[in-house]
Structure formats: structure tokens, C-alpha cells
Amino acid sequence: MAKSIIYNDEARRALERGMDILAEAVAVTLGPKGRNVVLEKKFGSPQIINDGITIAKEIELEDHVENTGVSLIRQAASKTNDVAGDGTTTATVLAHAIVKEGLRNVAAGANPISLKRGIDKATDFLVARIKEHAQPVGDSKAIAQVGAISAGNDEEVGQMIANAMDKVGQEGVISLEEGKSMTTELEITEGMRFDKGYISPYFVTDAERMEAVLEDPRILITDKKINLVQDLVPILEQVARQGKPLLIIAEDIEKEALATLVVNRLRGVLNVAAVKAPGFGDRRKQMLEDIATLTGGQVISEDAGLKLESATVDSLGSARRINITKDNTTIVAEGNEAAVKSRCEQIRRQIEETDSSYDKEKLQERLAKLAGGVAVIKVGAATETEMKDRKLRLEDAINATKAAVEEGIVPGGGTTLAHLAPQLEDWATGNLKDEELTGALIVARALPAPLKRIAENAGQNGAVISERVKEKEFNVGYNAASLEYVDMLAAGIVDPAKVTRSALQNAASIAGMVLTTECIVVDKPEKEKAPAGAPGGDFDY
């Protein structure tokens, strides 16, 4: 296909146009008075949401060059979502603001490479400052505040996540499920999560979230490598007759056997998924035994005199639900409390008896996985559209609370970044010079952008409010919900430090790359072929 090649300022301006479109669509959702965005779906009803990354993923422009700009800024949001699970809108607004400021300087003749160096140095300084100002999350009240802010000022959701963390521990698993009623409920069930995902992406059942979800499945657990599909055929036939989904947990699966499973899955013969067994060596065998205890199944192992080809449905485990992503598998089990309890006691005795600190640590991990359980939040809503929106908000809230536990909290509502702008200016003026100084000052001018946008979405003058906030103490910011200046930490308006840090780092990274762009190569749009003309010939009139 022929390519279009665009140079210099024209290239950067085309990228900027794409960024403007995406940033505006995402920025309307920022803050307590942010609005929703409606996404048209080819199949099913439209989606009404308030989630930055979901909106960013939907935007595709007709112009190839502008679309490249959209993809670049989407990357900042996507990376922030991967690392921190929240803060995608902040990352988008920041990246857009840094690019806008930077392009003015590049157009005026500044050297983009030196500017980028200045932006990078400013980012390192700010990351260190965010860490200094972060305060550890002390109690469940602080966790509830983080969850409530991230879920769009929903205090009930914040409290529910705090309760879930109390029950399953801060490292515990909190999973989301679509409820059957109008109310959102919390349920603590037996279950565990281990860090192995699906072997093949063809096992995915929810393409949008790239997850495989199996309801009421049977579970085949084996410690051997599956080389031949013939070994699996008897058990596959028995499960297919029952009409239940099947999860296979094995050391590995050879390509030929895996291909057969994938074909059966795609043809709808059997809803099947496969994951590799967690751990290695003797620990793998013990973890498989834990999973077998939890699910009421048996480990098909030659050590126990059991062979795959002679396995029956009775040796399979069962669960209420299994969620598999590319990185981990969550099993929500039911009704094996006595067996799980005695298994936990056995592990506790092993912990007491062992002298090795490494073994102790690994046994503690196993105990936490087995005894901790899984907190299931059943999301309730009146309509499917509201359900999807609530689910996305809850997902953000869970990720934000986990990020807060990891790296602490800072004043929210864009306050931290706005207060750091004058500190950055002072540091840069004393430590940098020439165009590197200009690069750092570009970041300083862009830092209040999230606060300005939050104020504008609340119908206020963003520029005036950000200047007033800068004059006040570090913890004091603007509460856009009540339209007043308050101590953000005391008012419970907080952001996880990890989210603020990730948003800033990813925004600065993408902005630096855009500013140093001198040429873009994109596909030329194909011209529509003219339809065939009518056939010629003699006509009788």
C-alpha cells in the first residue's frame, strides 16, 4: 500500500489535532461533576460510561495521521491503567497539556531533544517529591475514601471495598460479578488466585476485557505434561455430555493437544480453557493439592497411581465461577469448608515445624491463598447500561485502593500536581539552564491542567482556581463538589500516590516522544473504485 510522508511542523500539528479530539472526549469525565460519554455499539445497546480508558479505546478517526495522534495519547492512558488501574483521564489531560505547551516552543525554534531532556529531568524530580508527600494508608476509613473518590464519589462503594479488604486482607482477591438484584452486595466465599493465565488467547470468552469466564465448571488437575490429545478424549467426552465448561490445570500442553482443545472451543463443542500449573518442583505438587482440596477434586498424578486416560468425572473438581486473564486465574469455590479447614491446619503445622525462612514464607503464601478466600462484589443496577458503568467504576475503585495500600495517598483533585508546579519552577531555575530549563518549565505550566479541568467541569474558572490553590498550603485544594477550598486529606479527597506518579510518568514519556517527532509515515487512504458502467449495445426505441 502507498504511504504518505509528512514532515516538520505539519506532522506535529496533525498529531496535535488527533490528541485534541481524544483529550476533549476523555476530559469531560474528570472530577466529581464530570459528565458521561455515550459509546455506540455495533451489537447491543449503547454504553454510557465515565471511564477514561474505555472511551480512549473506542476512538478511531478517519484521518490516518490524526488517528496516529489518538493512538499515542491512548498509550499514556493504557500504560497508566496497566500499572495503577486508575488515573487514565489524568494521564490523558496531562499528556495533552505538555504537548500543547511544548509545541509552542518547538514552533518558536527550540531544540526538541533538549526540551525532552528537560521534561525527563523534571519528571524525575516530581516523582521523588510525590513519594516524599505520600502518606501511608492507616485504616479502613482511608481505604473507603480512596474507593469512594475513584468510584465517582460513591461512599457506599468505598465502604464496601474497605469491608472486603478487612475480610480478605490487603493482598486478598476482590472479584466483581453481575448481581441479580438492584442493590450492590458483598459476599465472602472460599476461593483462591494463582499467577498463571490462559495458555492460548483463543480460550477468551469476553473479548473486550480479554478474560475467560467459566460458570459452574469442572476442573481437571494434573501434574504431568499433556502430549497426546488421545489421553484427554475420554474425560472430554464425559464432560461434554454433562454440558459443563472444563478448566484444565496441567504442567504444560503440547501444541497438537492444545490445537484440538482450541478447535473444540471455537466450534462450540465444549467450553474449555487451559492454564499451566502454578509453582515448580515439589511446591507445584503441593499447590495442586491445595486447589484439589478447594474444589473437591483429585490430582491426577502417576505418583498416586492415576492416569489421565482412565480419569472419570468423579475425579474432577468443581467451582462456582472461574475468571482467567492473561496473567492469573481466580477460582471462586463453594462448599468444601471442612476439607479446606483441615488442609489449612496441616499447612500451619508445617510452618511451625520448618526451620527454613524461605520455606516458611512460601508456606505462609499458600496458607493466605487458601484461607483468605475471595471477596465477591455483586454489582446491582436497574438496567444493563447502568450495570456496565457501575462495574467499570468499581473496577477503578478496587485498583485505586490497592495502589493506595502499596505507595500511600496524596491530596486529590489535581491538588498535588498543582502545588508541585512552583516547587519544580524553583528547582529547575537553580539546577537547569537553556533549553533543558525550558523543557522543565513546560511541565511546570502543564501540571495544573487536571485541576483546571476539574474546576471547568464544575462550571468554574479553572485558571483562577489553580492560581489560588498554588498560594495555599500543600494539603489545601479545591473541592469541586462543594465549590470551596478545603484541606483535602481532612475532607477525604485523596488520590493514591502510585496513580498520580504513573499518570505523570506516562504523560511525560508520550509528550516527549511527540515533541521529538520530525516525520510521520502513514498509509494513504484508498480511493473508492468507481462502480462498473452499464453495458453498451444497440437499443431499439
Swiss-Prot record:
It is found in: Cytoplasm. GO terms for biological process: chaperone cofactor-dependent protein refolding; protein refolding; response to heat. Gene3D superfamilies: GroEL, GroEL-like equatorial domain, TCP-1-like chaperonin intermediate domain. Its main location: cytoplasm. Its EC number is 5.6.1.7. ATP binds at residues 29-32, 86-90, 413, 479-481, 495. It catalyses: ATP + H2O + a folded polypeptide = ADP + phosphate + an unfolded polypeptide. GO terms for molecular function: ATP binding; ATP-dependent protein folding chaperone; isomerase activity; unfolded protein binding. GO terms for cellular component: GroEL-GroES complex. Induction: By stress conditions e.g. heat shock. Disulfide bonds: none annotated. CDD domains: GroEL. Keywords: ATP-binding, Chaperone, Cytoplasm, Isomerase, Nucleotide-binding, Stress response. The keyword Cell membrane does not apply. It holds the Pfam family Cpn60_TCP1. It comes from the Bacteria. It is an enzyme of class 5 (isomerase). Together with its co-chaperonin GroES, plays an essential role in assisting protein folding. The GroEL-GroES system forms a nano-cage that allows encapsulation of the non-native substrate proteins and provides a physical environment optimized to promote and accelerate protein folding. HAMAP family: CH60. PANTHER family: 60 KDA HEAT SHOCK PROTEIN, MITOCHONDRIAL. Forms a cylinder of 14 subunits composed of two heptameric rings stacked back-to-back. Interacts with the co-chaperonin GroES. Belongs to the chaperonin (HSP60) family. This is Chaperonin GroEL 1. The gene is groEL1.
